Amino acid sequence: MRTQWPSPAKLNLFLYITGQRADGYHTLQTLFQFLDYGDTISIELRDDGDIRLLTPVEGVEHEDNLIVRAARLLMKTAADSGRLSTGSGANISIDKRLPMGGGLGGGSSNAATVLVALNHLWQCGLSMDELAEMGLTLGADVPVFVRGHAAFAEGVGEILMPVDPPEKWYLVAHPGVSIPTPVIFKDPELPRNTPKRSIETLLKCEFSNDCEVIARKRFREVDAVLSWLLEYAPSRLTGTGACVFAEFDTESEARQVLEQAPEWLNGFVAKGVNLSPLHRAML
């Protein structure tokens, strides 16, 4: 039997770089919220112990794909602790809507959905804490998708505190470029000393993203989309880009602006949600 699982996008409602560690990783403060929009992952169980991704992602080797790595990691961890039946495997396919290098967390979300779904389908019985710990070895953003609740994140993004920001409507626009995260984090002009503040203080301040100034400077497409959106609503970069988003109180307001968008602006309208669609599907 084939089952389908949501793999939602996320937005960074704000993102501040507070320092850089000796190992080169940046410390940050950010606010994650999910969107009711994303990829869909389909899983069909196998009984020969094999993991097969039936829909390869262009430019990514099969064994390097986060979906495959997540499945193999869960398989090994569960088998080593005697919590996996012999022969457990899976055929996995993905209906991909989220762009790569867009700052929407697509790859991390895919990995998290596979961990959560296969843990359920294989009846491994691993806790969310165990799955989140495994997810962190795959990427800093994976744990928030595993846990499935909007969160304030610190450290390198791994220290999570559940929060409930307002669930606004967003027009999310993709400028048509992919921004590799290292391009932003290696830029010498990236602000790296934003003062740390409490979540209570941050929620009262106007939200912004320290990476935005670099993305706009290095990618004129990002600058063009943001300049257009800012004419209509508060707008900013998500993650390290390339996607940007404008914030609205209602769906109709967001759709009215999207309808006026120039042809070169590709976007969609989605609602911010504090409970991940993946976890909502499991209730």
UniProtKB/Swiss-Prot annotation:
Q: Which UniProt keywords apply?
A: ATP-binding, Isoprene biosynthesis, Kinase, Nucleotide-binding, Transferase
InterPro entries per UniProt: GHMP_kinase_C_dom (IPR013750), GHMP_kinase_C_sf (IPR036554), GHMP_kinase_N_dom (IPR006204), IspE (IPR004424), Ribosomal_Su5_D2-typ_SF (IPR020568), Ribsml_uS5_D2-typ_fold_subgr (IPR014721)
Query: Could you say which EC number(s) this protein's record lists?
Result: 2.7.1.148
Q: Where is the signal peptide?
A: none
Top-level enzyme category: transferase
Name the positions where ATP binds.
Answer: 99-109
UniProt-annotated catalytic positions:
10, 141
In its UniProt record, which GO terms are filed under biological process? isopentenyl diphosphate biosynthetic process, methylerythritol 4-phosphate pathway; terpenoid biosynthetic process
Instruction: Name any one GO molecular function.
Output: 4-(cytidine 5'-diphospho)-2-C-methyl-D-erythritol kinase activity
Q: Which reaction does it catalyse?
A: 4-CDP-2-C-methyl-D-erythritol + ATP = 4-CDP-2-C-methyl-D-erythritol 2-phosphate + ADP + H(+)
Subunit structure comment from the entry: Homodimer.
Q: What does this protein do?
A: Catalyzes the phosphorylation of the position 2 hydroxy group of 4-diphosphocytidyl-2C-methyl-D-erythritol.
Q: What is this protein called?
A: 4-diphosphocytidyl-2-C-methyl-D-erythritol kinase
Which organism is the protein's source? Escherichia coli O6:H1 (strain CFT073 / ATCC 700928 / UPEC)
